[in-house]
Amino acid sequence: PYAGPVVFLLLGGFLLALGIERWDLHRRIALTVVSLVGVRADRLLLGFMIATAFLSMWISNSATAMLMVPIGIAVIVSVGAVDEHDRKSTERDEEDDLLVGVRGEPVERPATGFGLALMLGIAYSASIGGVATLIGSPPNAVFAGVAESRLDVQISFLDWLVFAGPLSIVFLFVAWLLLVKLLRPEIPIEQGAEDVIRTQREELGGISRGERRMLAVFTLVAAGWLLRPFVLQPLFPAITDTVVAIVGGVLLFVVPVDYEAREFLLDWSDATRLPWGVLLLLGAGFSLANAFRESGLDTVIAESFAGVAGAPLVVLVLVIAIVVVFLTEVTSNTATATVFMPIMISLGITLGESPLMLMATAALAASMAFMLPVATPPNAVVFGSGYVTIPQMSRIGLWLNLLGIIATIVLTYLWLPIAFATAG
């Protein structure tokens, strides 16, 4: 299980993310997207959320939040989107504000509508964007790995994107509308926001050779994942999404940026920052799923749900979504998905329902935790900025949790049979 295809798929994805981070390509993408939407409060919020969600599709949710929070804080400080009565006690230079966001040191600094909306928007869109791809969030990879090992159903990168991509896009705009309606963000000084974004883009300078080559490798890998079923697989059936990911990861170590200086897109000093813990947790999860099966524990647990045998499938999906969403508020989403996947398989078989549908419900619901700082790393990073309090996050997050449950049910019940029609 520790050397399964999904583990290596995630390994390749992590290497790609490290390369993107090393050459600051993610920062350039984020600032470009934000600058395109304009500086009106609602548009600026949408720009930040789109940029965050897109990056979160390819690099970890926590790394995305760590990138976007300092940029967001710089904008908030520049436009004066902090309560007037908090100014005297919170005056500090811009560098200190950025460090607070990066270090995650909570401070007493409530923000008005725009500051609060921007911080929450970054946290929520980091989680929402991660839903869209197999490498975006560990529960997605857990789902694919268990489906392949237990059901012999192969979920490709494109399969998952077709399935979860629409949810990610629609739910991103739902979250944006909710923040706009509930918080009514306004920018006191629009020019300040424009100046900050322009200054940060100027600091990046022109696109470097490393960025260009990193973008080329990233585009090649993404195209390989998306076009593999149509272009690569008919010619080379042995090529899987995992092969594409590993080839892309290897390319990062051999594509030179400055050959004479022996500088490449990635070196081992960068690779030591790989999140090995996540890969080990994933392998442990697959081992746990096998242990559930071999011991018969999954069947015992599934049979304990015999009381819901006569309930409609939509009710069963609703119950699973509610339980997983609120459980994930206080536990790791990866751990939650790992425990639930084998149970969902046995439950589906016991009740005569589609195990894949129940598993997908649990996988999606595990990423729909928006209420508490401990629920997800992006929530914790944003809370650490000091611009968001727990009651504020809980109040907005509860609405998103409920909407996330509804969206999960609709997607799995209506769209999954169509999206996964060719999977396997």
Regions found by a protein language model. Give the residues of each.
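Hydrophobic transmembrane alpha-helices of multi-pass small-molecule transporters
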Residues: P1-L11, A17-L18, S149-I155, D159-E303, ...
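A cytosolic-side transmembrane-helix exit/cap motif
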Residues: P1-G4, R28, D83-D96, E260-W268, ...
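Membrane-embedded alpha-helical segments and adjacent helix-loop junctions characteristic
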Residues: P1-K88, D93, G101-R109, G277-L351
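C-terminal transmembrane helix pair
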Residues: D96-G101, A123, G165, L280-L288, ...
